[in-house]
Curated annotation (Swiss-Prot):
Matches recorded under CDD domains: archRadA (cd19515)
Lineage: Archaea, Thermoproteota, Thermoprotei, Desulfurococcales, Desulfurococcaceae
GO biological process: DNA recombination; DNA repair
NCBIfam families with a match to the protein in the record: PRK04301.1, recomb_radA
Keywords: ATP-binding, DNA damage, DNA recombination, DNA-binding, Nucleotide-binding
Domain of life: Archaea
Similarity field: Belongs to the eukaryotic RecA-like protein family.
Cited function: Involved in DNA repair and in homologous recombination. Binds and assemble on single-stranded DNA to form a nucleoprotein filament. Hydrolyzes ATP in a ssDNA-dependent manner and promotes DNA strand exchange between homologous DNA molecules.
Protein name: DNA repair and recombination protein RadA
Alphabetical list of Pfam families matching this protein: Rad51
HAMAP family tied to this protein: RadA_arch
SUPFAM superfamilies: P-loop containing nucleoside triphosphate hydrolases, Rad51 N-terminal domain-like
Family annotation (SMART domains): AAA
Positions that bind ATP: G118, E119, Y120, G121, S122, G123, K124, T125
Amino acid sequence: MSEEKETIKERSSGFISVRDIPGVGSSIADKLEAAGYLSAWSIVVARAEELAERTGLPVLTVQKIIENARKMLGITFKTAREVKQERLNIGKITTGSKSLDELLGGGVETKTITEFFGEYGSGKTQICHQLSVNVQLTPEKGGLNGRAVYIDTEGTFRWERIEAMARALGLDPDKVMDNIYYMRAYNSDHQIAIVDELFTFVPKNDVRLVILDSVTSHFRAEYPGREHLAERQQKLNSHLHQLMRLAEAYNVAVVVTNQVMARPDVFYGDPTTAVGGHVLAHTPGVRIQLRKSKGNKRIARVVDAPHLPEGEVVFVITEEGIRDSEEE
């Protein structure tokens, strides 16, 4: 590989300001930053129409900026070997359970959306609490040396659990809680606005994990019935793609939880399915179903992940957090 390509790869791995994009002067850069576009990567993953609307810049100007950003970052066809190398460099966060980590291919990955869905009490929120602590660990211990954003749509966040999980890992609970940015989302519009704001917030605050617990609850409550289904799915689809762009632009792990509903047409096997239909079924890179078992035991099963084999494991929820089951 040429020195020029090596330089491009090195530059694309870190934070590069929009001011470094060829053809972007100070006045245009000011408009981009005011609209929340701080890095070249945030420009690359943006839609031209959306970027023009938010900045007030002409569409043709915006298209040229996006084109220049892509050229600067060397975004073009890659060999399968280059894709492999990029995959090997993706960050992973431990769940606290070795068996669950193995099921996930080494932990919860950056640059993708991981969905945990299941019935009430299946462990979705417990995993989210654990991940928001574990992301702060060093890479040697399964973390990313980063901070977490926790978007709570149902009021299930509990600082007491964070404290207990931090102490179990020998961490200072106050320092751990200082590194978790919490926001309560009160409706779907507020939820969408929070995610939009993260394009500015994430790079400024060393955030490596974004949690949305849960992604569908507001949409489900605000758009009931078949007459609102199309509008709900369109809005949810746009929201999920914004989360995907966030994960890819800033190399963060995005974790969403989801509820389940009964399927009256299923007479054999598991009669439940995740809320959100085809829109949510196709967007997350990894989908994990959680089920209750005896006592504090929970079962996790890979439902959809292109790089993972099908399988399931048992883990437990203890006072200290997510841990391996003795059965594993």
